[in-house]
Amino acid sequence: MINPIALKCGPLAIHWYALCILSGLVLAVYLASKEAPKKGISSDAIFDFILIAFPLAIVGARIYYVIFEWSYYVKHLDEIIAIWNGGIAIYGGLITGALVLLAYCYNKVLNPIHFLDIAAPSVMVAQAIGRWGNFINQEAYGKAVSQLNYLPSFIQKQMFIEGSYRIPTFLYESFWNLLGFVIIMMWRRKPKSLLDGEIFAFYLIWYGSGRLVIEGMRTDSLMFLGIRISQYVSALLIIIGLIFVIKRRRQKGISYYQE
């Protein structure tokens, strides 16, 4: 089993979970800052946005998780802020981040569609890296299986939880996000292939589809009325993405992302 603490300096402990999230963030910001000027948004605007959005997204992700696990946290109030032990919901972070983005664009008089198009691929790669924090914390895993011989030994060992090997759903989602990132990065280079806003719509449809399937394999998901909450949200993302693309294609005068 991998020690969840990467470094320890006196009373200060740095967890792998935090390092995975921060590594994903750094790469995401770098990619977004390089792309932003092509759409008339300065790199400084990306950095300023992240300084506001990232801490709020972490808080939003934690609040989302705690709300749907309130039956546990009402008895363990001291653990509500213990995010180093895991327990942040990606959808909570995404919803919070999107709201902050809209407010930021309104305040700075920026085009939110352009901002979302720039952010979407970066979010994908950040999520792909961040999921490895779940791996080290032994969370976000799937049902018990007899063996995982198709995986490297270090993954097999870490996925041996409560006396059984577990489906590495973290790995599936990480790979799915990485594949989506590669596809959209290649696609957006082609002139007149994507309208403004369709990169973001692709993210909604791609991520929503993958998450909808992968959530069905998990055993530790938050539930509501017998269905996993993330599956409700995933279905909603797919619907929003499809409606957005259909309406966008019917509108006249919409510019292409890459002319």
Swiss-Prot record:
Enzyme Commission code(s) on record: 2.5.1.145
Residues holding a 1,2-diacyl-sn-glycero-3-phospho-(1'-sn-glycerol): R131
Keyword Zinc in record: no
Gene Ontology MF annotations: phosphatidylglycerol-prolipoprotein diacylglyceryl transferase activity
Cell compartment(s), UniProt: Cell membrane
A Pfam family: LGT
Single GO biological process annotation from the record: lipoprotein biosynthetic process
Annotated function: Catalyzes the transfer of the diacylglyceryl group from phosphatidylglycerol to the sulfhydryl group of the N-terminal cysteine of a prolipoprotein, the first step in the formation of mature lipoproteins.
Family label: Belongs to the Lgt family.
Protein name: Phosphatidylglycerol--prolipoprotein diacylglyceryl transferase
